[in-house]
Each structure stands twice: as structure tokens, then as C-alpha cells.
């Protein structure tokens, strides 16, 4: 219902609402300005926001202040200004468009943002303030700060809270209320603090804008460590500004330009600060923002000529209020210029590294409408339509430039409408000029489907790390698009190492729990590739930290394998299970021990992980550490309460068996020092000495012998350590055992001695060591001597060694004379 013109509710074109028109009141914010409620309009079927007065009882003065704020917001209708619909009678409040994302202050504190989004926010804020300052007279905001910069569902800026806004020169310092001063003081220029009677001008907002730039680049609050308002005021007046730490190790080059601009904007002398508004080039500050965010290869020409890109395209911008119809014409301009005609140049800002020039993408001529021309005049609104999606995009021709070089081989897309990124519900109440429209194209029978074309564009943007392009083309329905490989776009971004693209996908609510064909979630991939920034972003969402891939590995398994201490701590803070097992029964502790990640083992031990938890075949973490020879971990685990150094696997092997088998001398020594039994037997009755002798680890065998290992112990098959060393040809180990008085006459399977085994396998050097008058002609249970076995195996060198030492040739040996090998030849010669 409309208010009467003569009442305090006279609102011109604004509407007056009753409380009964709203339902579902939900408080979403509060402060010195009052309370903000999210409400649903009964008839409009959409969500709105109502900013109510902080007072329970609103007098006429407060009511008039609220009306004045509403009128100022109505007067300042612009794409980057928060739309206002009217006043609610009771409770008294300002009815505005609901911003789903909330304030910039909240967003900056929530998670790291993509650089392209940060640049776009700075750019859109500058354009919104430029609009206010271009009004006649200029409208001063006077309270510009992240809390008063709202963001819609697609992260576009809407400047709000005009409670302090005044027309140029009509307000004094004493108008500032102490309500909410603490959140505002860091954004106040020094002249406002110092000069009580000073008339305000546009330079006030310029200073505040500089602090906003600092906050967006650093994602911190200015003077956050200072808790006293007076101390902040003294610092600002004395010329202190927020510190400039390295914004980011891999920050884009545009940061340097913005930092220089920011430092100019927060100068103590307001006269040397740049301005938003101006003549010809739309104001010095807008020009500086564009210069910082447009490709660094471009340059400004002389005043009035515009910005020259490398392609010789010249962009001229004019004051947005050069005619009273400019807002309407801007909306019409957007409708006349589809999104598909906004193209990326070869020098778009790349957050990772400077892109290489691609001359085929940036033509020397620009076609617009029907007449080709080199120099085109563009209004500010046209320029903004080119820049608002990627900040670093330039103006190119329409049809022939509609694809990037990586997409030029694709057929043109088929028919079908592409949404602008605004849902149907949101678009009904979006401010004028905030929608970017695209038009249908004529279908072609040879064209790829729209989905396939869009999918390829998204893949190309992510793989190339073109975040600005991704921000432009990503539609809400495409966020969880399944690729041909079964992966999602988020999988692709993580796999390609494109952290900025992953940030944008997550900001657009990409599902972090989707799995690819291997069962891996983006968290698996991010942890495996040690992309810490993405890991932090993923864990900040509702995510299944214990999701398993096809091998039953969780993200914590990957962190343990890589020794990624940071990811391990983050996962444990999110209650990742330390007892999840993979297909081999290994927990993250088992994996960390297997891969020698002592730092992870210590973290898990501090978390109270049970080190006696058995994996497949009853392997403990200590078994894995001993098997791989990770001495520090063996020491650490062996000293844990309740750990037995003689713990056996399913086949009866102890950690000492495993260390001896792999020849880890130092591990074996520390285990023995910690009272490991050197004579413990496995299920095959093998002692650690048997294992060391069989694998030829002489130093470990010597250690075991000196620590009391039995030389004559036999396995379940009847082998001694000497038998095993001789059979496998380990000469050094055989010498050691002989020196240690091992029985060379001991009989094993088939009643064979160590010499029989060495001869049968052709180990001539071992035969040389073992041969003696006592054993050279001994027979096994089959009646074969060492010479018979060597000849049977056709080991000529071994036969020669035995013959040289006087081995006896008998009928059994002669049956091999009919052969043609070297062994048979030797036997025939010896017989002759």
C-alpha cells in the first residue's frame, strides 16, 4: 500500500509494507545500525531483507532518518548499489533485496578467495562509488567498509548502508554516532578525526576505499591487533596505515599496481588523493583501477584518448551521467550486447603466471555493429559489461572472436539459452543492470550439443588456470558437471593444480564429496598432491573426511604416506578416524611406519593411536617399520607401553625376522638391545639367523651369532643356516658360518650336506670353501655325491673344482659322459 504524500511515510516511488506481508522472520545480523532480518514476502514468493531500527520505539526523528536513507538508496539506483523496495510500518524498517552471500566482511573472514574474485570486488566497489560521486551533487557514503559491501549469490558487489550518506559539503564530523564506531574508525580518514568542523568531500570515501583494498588483498581486518579506539585514531592521525605484509607468495602482478593505488588513496593530505569522478576518463581513480586490473601490456594514451591494448583497440569511457537517461541506456546496452560477445584477450590476468602472447586471439581490427573501425567510443556501462566478469577482459569483435584459441576447432554451439548465472528467483528482484543476458543462436546440424560445448569450455578454463574465464562461463547447473572421465570439475581443478579455480568452484557450492571412477574425492586428490590451500577450503565445508577410494584409502592415509604434517593435523582436527583400514588392513599409522614418516607417527601417537592394532596377517606398525628399516620409528614404537618387540605376524615372524631378512643391521641391533629373542622361530621354524643366512646379509648374521643365535638350529624342512647360505651361493655368509664352527657335515633334506646343495646349484666358489677330504665324496640318500649333482646340473666350473680337489669318478658319474655339455667333456677327460 502506498503512503500518502502529506504523511511522514511519503516515499515517492517507494512502497510502504505492513508486517503481515512478510513471514519467516530470521535474524541474520545486528549491530549499531540495528537488526537485519531475512523475511519472505507472502505474495512475491521471494526473500527480502528488513533493516530495523535499534530502538524498540521509533520516534519521528528516527523515522525521518530511515526515510532519508531509503530515498538516498532509491535515488542511487545502480547495478552495484543495493536495491531498496520501501519501508515496513511496524516494526519500522527498511525493506531491501536480500543478499544471499552476506557482507564482504563475512566472506573475507571465511576462506581464501580467488584472486580474480578479489580484483572483481575491488573493481565493482570502485564503479559503485564512482556512480555515487557522479551524482549532482555527489552523494558521499561516509561509511564505506567491508561490512557495508554486500554480495549477491554470484558474488557481485552491492554497496549498502547509506545511514551516514550526505550530499557533498552538507555534513559535519559531529554527525558521526558512536554506535558502531569501533568497526568504522579504521576506515575514517585522518582529517575527519582531526578537524571537527571540516566539510566532507569525496576524498573521505577515497580513503575508506583504500582501506577496503587493503582488506580485500590481505583478507584481514585493519589494525586488528589494536583493541583501543583512541590508539587507532592517534595512529591514523600520525600517518600510520595498516602494515603491508607480503600479500601472497604467488600473487598476481596486478597486486603491485593495486598496492600503489591504495597508497595514493590513503595519503594524509586529501588534496593528493585521486578521485572517483572526473572528466573524459571517468575520473582518475576509476582509470587507475582499470589500469591496475587490465592486462599489463596495455597502456593509457593521452587524456581523452582512452586505454590502448596491444591489439590497437582503444577504449574510451564517458561519465555515466552524461545524460539523464544513462541508467536506462545502460540496461538497454546490456540487453543489446550478449555475454557471448564479451571475449577474453590473450593477456587476461593469470593468477599463476603471465600468459604467453597469442596473436591469433587479439586481432588488429575490431568489428562492431555494421561498420568496421579502429577506434570505438565506449560508455562506462559498456566498459563495465566487458570487465565485470573477469576484470581483466578486453573488448573484441563479436562472432569471429567468440572462441578462445583452444576452442577454435570446436563447431559453434547449438541452440539453447544460457543463464547469466542468476537464478529465476533472484533475477526477479535484482537491481537494474545487474543481469547479463545472452541470446539464442541458430542451430546447426553439425554443431556439438550445448552441454558438450559448455563442458569443453569449462575444462579448458580450468586446465589453463583461467579463473576469470571460469567466473564468466560457470553456470549454477554446471558446478557438479560430470566429465567423461567420471570426475567433477572440482576433481579436475585439484588434479591440474589450479587452486584459484578450485576456490571459485567451492564458492559456488561445488559438492566436495563427489567421487570419480576410482572412488577418490577432491579431498583425496588435494591431500595426495599436497595442495594445502584446497585442503583447508574443503575441510571448511561439510565433507566426509573418512571417505574411501577404491583401495579403501582415506585422505589421512595419503597424508600419512606423504609425511604431510599440515594436512594430517587439519584432518585430525576434523575428526578423521585414525583406525580406518585399507584393503590390506593398514591404518594411517601402518602407512606412516611403512613409509618412514616419523613426524606423522609422533602426531598419531600424541593422539593416542593404538600401536598394537593389527593389520592384514597380524602385521603391527612395528613390523612395517622394521621391514622398511626405519630406525627412528622402530626406536619410537618399541619403547611405547604395551608394545612387544617379539610380536609375531600370522606366519610367526617377529620384527627381528623382518629386519634380518632385509639386512637392516642397525634395526636388528636396536631390537636385540631391546631384548628381542634371537632364537624365536616362525611357523616354518626359521630363526632370524636362518633368514639372514638365506638372504646373504652377513653383517646381520654375524650380529645374531655374537648375540647367541643357534648355529645348528634347523627349519621345519631340516635346513641349518649353513645349508641355506650354501644353497643360495652367499660366499661371505658361508665363510662366516665356517669360521664360527658351523657343522659342515650336518645333513639336511635328502640327507644332503651344505656341499651337496652348493654343487647342485653350481656355486663353485662356495664349493671351493666347503670342499674337504671328509665331505667331497659323501653320498646323499639317493647315492649321489657332490660331483654327481654338479654334473647332473651341467655346472662345468663346479665339476672342475671338485675334480681338482680329487673328487672320485664312479659309474654314476660315467653315465653323464654321453652328454655334449662342458661337464660331460670334463668327466670323459678325467676318466681318460
Curated annotation (Swiss-Prot):
Residues joined by cross-link Glycyl lysine isopeptide (Lys-Gly) (interchain with G-Cter in ubiquitin): 51, 145
Sorted UniProt keywords: ANK repeat, ATP-binding, Cytoplasm, Disease variant, Ectodermal dysplasia, Isopeptide bond, Kinase, Membrane, Nucleotide-binding, Phosphoprotein, Receptor, Repeat, Serine/threonine-protein kinase, Transferase, Ubl conjugation
Keyword Kinase annotated: yes
Start-end of Acidic residues biased regions: 329-342
Effect of residue 184 to I: In BPS; loss of function
Subcellular compartments: Cytoplasm; Membrane
Effect of residue 666 to H: In BPS; uncertain significance
Predominant subcellular localization, coarse grouping: cytoplasm
Impact upon substituting residue 163 to D: In CHANDS; uncertain significance
SUBUNIT field: Interacts with PRKCB. Interacts with TRAF1, TRAF2, TRAF3 and TRAF5. Interacts with BIRC2/c-IAP1, BIRC3/c-IAP2 and XIAP/BIRC4.
Family from the record: Belongs to the protein kinase superfamily. TKL Ser/Thr protein kinase family.
Protein name: Receptor-interacting serine/threonine-protein kinase 4
